[in-house]
């Protein structure tokens, strides 16, 4: 830790306080996340340190770079590259009655999918994607923060400040208590974020797990074994759920064109194996008019 100096507190993340800091000798500005774990007395589990150290290998222009993992008196500090703005703050800053430029929506979504595909290929899930952990710079680049931390530290029900962790972007298989889930959970979250990029409003903003599920069901219909094999045997599925018919996604997301709505619907398919993958989504016609050669990952993809 002696290599870094804290400049100021910039926020409170899922796992602890986040500081803006600087590397003393290089002057590099960084984000310093102090990880606060439930079992504070026992110190940091070695499994968590091992898991998180592997994340230093995730090097991609659309993934926030983990630069260092440091221990100080049984506290774990994660040192990340610094970006000053997150997507939530940016969406909140757009004046009332105005919306994000449709080409910027497209560019951001494509870059998010690039970052997710890169991590999924390396068997790393995010599990807690939301606008707050999508960071942006002033050149049109968006990067995913906190990839892999859920596996290292778990996804807490509450932030250490006791603020409830948002359920708005959580996939239905997670909400229904599925013991096994995989990469489609991140695609679902990305779909809900896609809708929010277009409308500035969360697509499904529940205030409890059951309210979250019912908001999804009211729009997409209550799932059953016909549309999602074995959903009725998931731990938190109840046969007493109201049986809503599928509503209209297009009436909730008015700012998307036909291709955009088609891609969104494919990202929000109930049955996880049938949900579009990040890689498949990147080849969807919605992106046909996006100049991918200008995107930060173009050099590594040979575009």
From Swiss-Prot:
Protein name: Cyclin-dependent kinase 1
Main EC class the enzyme belongs to: transferase
Residues forming the catalytic site: 128 (proton acceptor)
Compartment(s) of residence: Nucleus; Cytoplasm, Cytoskeleton, Microtubule organizing center, Centrosome
Any one GO biological process: regulation of mitotic cell cycle, embryonic
Recorded GO MF terms: ATP binding; cyclin-dependent protein serine/threonine kinase activity; protein serine kinase activity; RNA polymerase II CTD heptapeptide repeat kinase activity
Start and end residues of each Protein kinase domain: 4-287
UniProt record similarity statement: Belongs to the protein kinase superfamily. CMGC Ser/Thr protein kinase family. CDC2/CDKX subfamily.
Keywords on record: ATP-binding, Cell cycle, Cell division, Cytoplasm, Cytoskeleton, Kinase, Mitosis, Nucleotide-binding, Nucleus, Phosphoprotein, Serine/threonine-protein kinase, Transferase
SMART domains assigned to the protein according to its UniProt record, in alphabetical order: S_TKc (SM00220)
């Amino acid at each position: 830790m002696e290599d870094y100096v804290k400049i100021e507190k910039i926020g409170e993340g899922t796992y602890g306080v986040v500081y803006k800091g600087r590397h003393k000798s290089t002057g590099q500005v960084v984000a310093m996340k102090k990880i606060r774990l439930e079992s504070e007395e026992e110190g940091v589990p070695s499994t968590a340190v091992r898991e998180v150290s592997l994340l230093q290998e995730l090097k991609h222009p659309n993934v926030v770079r983990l630069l260092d993992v440091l221990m100080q008196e049984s506290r774990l500090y994660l040192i990340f590259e610094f970006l000053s703005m997150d997507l939530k703050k940016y969406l909140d800053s757009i004046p009332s009655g105005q919306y994000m430029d449709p080409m910027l929506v497209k560019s951001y979504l494509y870059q998010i999918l690039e970052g997710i595909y890169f991590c999924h290929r390396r068997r790393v899930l995010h599990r807690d994607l939301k606008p707050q952990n999508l960071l942006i710079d002033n050149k049109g680049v968006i990067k995913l923060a906190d990839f892999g931390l859920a596996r290292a530290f778990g996804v807490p029900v509450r932030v250490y400040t006791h603020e409830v962790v948002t359920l708005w972007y959580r996939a239905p298989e997670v909400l229904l208590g599925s013991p096994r889930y995989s990469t489609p959970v991140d695609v679902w979250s990305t779909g809900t974020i896609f809708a929010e990029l277009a409308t500035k409003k969360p697509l499904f903003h529940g205030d409890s797990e059951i309210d979250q599920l019912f908001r999804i069901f009211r729009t997409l219909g209550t799932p059953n074994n016909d549309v999602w094999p074995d959903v009725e045997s998931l731990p938190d599925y109840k046969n007493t759920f109201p049986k809503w018919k599928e509503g209209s996604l297009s009436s909730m997301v008015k700012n998307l064109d036909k291709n955009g709505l088609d891609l969104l619907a494919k990202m929000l398919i109930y049955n996880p194996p049938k949900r579009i993958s990040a890689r498949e989504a990147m080849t969807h016609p919605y992106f046909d008019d996006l100049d991918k050669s200008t995107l930060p990952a173009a050099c590594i993809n040979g575009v």
